[in-house]
Amino acid sequence: MRLYGARGARRATLATEAELASAERAWAEVARTVRRFEPVTVLAGPGRAEGARALLGPGVDVVERPLDDAWMRDIGPTFVTRAEDGARAALDWTFNGWGAQEWARWEHDAKVGGEVAALAGVTAYRTGLVNEGGGLHVDGEGTVLLTETVQLDPDRNPGLSRAEAEAEIHAGLGTSKAVWLPRGLTGDYGRFGTRGHVDIVAAFARPGVVVAHTQPDPAHPDHEVCKEITGVLRAARDAAGRPLEVVEVPAPTVLEVDGAWADYSYINHYLCNGGVVLCAFDDPRDAEAAALFRRLFPDRTVVPVDARPVFAAGGGIHCITQQEPAPARGTRG
């Protein structure tokens, strides 16, 4: 497996040089951590490749490409593998700046999906569905988690029905069962939010088992939001007809950051070859979350990385990463 990341131009979510430098150090720490487990390729904007190489250190491939931002999960392709023969392809979602938000720019980022597929040497299949990689999560056995406020967002896909969205997604991913969450975390609807990405709320640990963000403190609006979401997950069945086992992952103790409701979440992790790169927040619950993920993934090394600078820019570790599966032996692409 190979990780793709990005180092773009100054982003709207990073207003000052200090914020940019802090975020880029965090981005680099994630890339270096993943490099311990698998190859890493980072896309860098024009004139930024040399600085990226200096920041990332040896062993990380840097490729110069025009970029608007750096959220590779959302602007990159979603790689898929055909079960019968292991052949790979890439879904190139239509990207429009998370619903054409006024602060977003996507002239270059809308092309990244196809460019990354070309770097990987696989065929890219362009889909007319406006979607981002952080807006879905699959179990590898036919089930996909979605959010009503993302795929059915009128600023993304005006007039699209749930059935139409499912048909497009199932055709591309090879899934057959969608579990729709009603919304995302409160903080994700702020100015630089995605309007409900699932990858900060819930993720499959393995088929039949979902980790779900919970907010123990009733003073935070996500306390009720998470109760609703976990209720939906517990009532759902996957593509095999199994009820989902829901493993609750309590949020960090901090409730507000810079006057806004915190959406710090341990769910936004990255699985790599033999490892789990886990968000950390210098919080008392960091150790509890790391222990929980070690129990869930006993054959992987769990490595916490301070994700606060990444969250300050609008996302987490999963949001800045995109995995390319290794080709099956004897196949091309």
Segments from the language model and where they lie:
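Histidine/cysteine-enriched polar flanking segments
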Residues: 1-333
